[in-house]
């Protein structure tokens, strides 16, 4: 797994696709999407781990099929050659699950990174956050 540090991401904010994949255990009564809407790294897109997983199973967060993955990623505006940085704001390291999905479906591993320390470290270092939601222009991602 390729980690990037907060300094690197801050210098490259406009050169990479940033994904917030925060997910919390139900008993925490926290909601990753609501937290994303209130505070996230500039240009981040939210990845809903529940909605973007296989639906016809009792097991949580199983990989979806390739066609569904293409639709999910295309609707996030991500292209096959995009460099991606994934982070979370949770105690369950949900960013790693999102990373695994991209690797499993063939995104170049050299282009998929996880932010070391996640949003927690970003905030601790007093780096800028926003509540602005970016306008996504869909792409044509293929597996």
Regions found by a protein language model. Give the residues of each.
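Aromatic- and Gly/Pro-rich amphipathic surface segment
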Residues: 38-41, 45-76
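Short active-site-adjacent helix-start/loop capping segments
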Residues: 26-29, 53-56, 92-96
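Thiolate-centered catalytic microenvironments shared by cysteine-dependent enzyme domains
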Residues: 60-143
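Anionic group-transfer/hydrolysis microenvironments
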Residues: 22, 50, 90
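A general structural signal for stabilizing positions within well-ordered secondary structure
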Residues: 35-38, 104
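Conserved beta-strand scaffold positions in the cores of enzyme catalytic domains, especially
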Residues: 18, 44-46, 112-114
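Short, well-ordered coil/turn elements that cap or connect secondary structure elements
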Residues: 13, 41, 107-109
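Flexible, polar/low-complexity N-terminal or interdomain linker segments that lie immediately upstream
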Residues: 1-33, 120-143
């Amino acid at each position: 797994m390729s980690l990037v540090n907060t300094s690197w991401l801050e210098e490259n904010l406009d050169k990479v696709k940033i994904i917030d994949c925060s997910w919390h255990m139900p008993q925490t009564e926290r909601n990753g999407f609501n937290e994303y809407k209130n505070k996230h790294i500039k240009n981040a897109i939210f990845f809903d781990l529940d909605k973007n997983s296989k639906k016809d199973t009792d097991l949580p967060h199983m990989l979806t099929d390739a066609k569904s993955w293409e639709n999910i990623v295309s609707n996030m505006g991500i292209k096959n050659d995009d460099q991606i940085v994934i982070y979370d704001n949770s105690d369950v390291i949900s960013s790693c699950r999102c990373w695994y999905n991209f690797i499993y479906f063939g995104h170049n591993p050299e282009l998929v990174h996880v932010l070391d320390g996640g949003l927690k470290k970003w905030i601790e270092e007093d780096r800028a956050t926003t509540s602005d939601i970016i306008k996504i222009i869909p792409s044509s991602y293929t597996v």
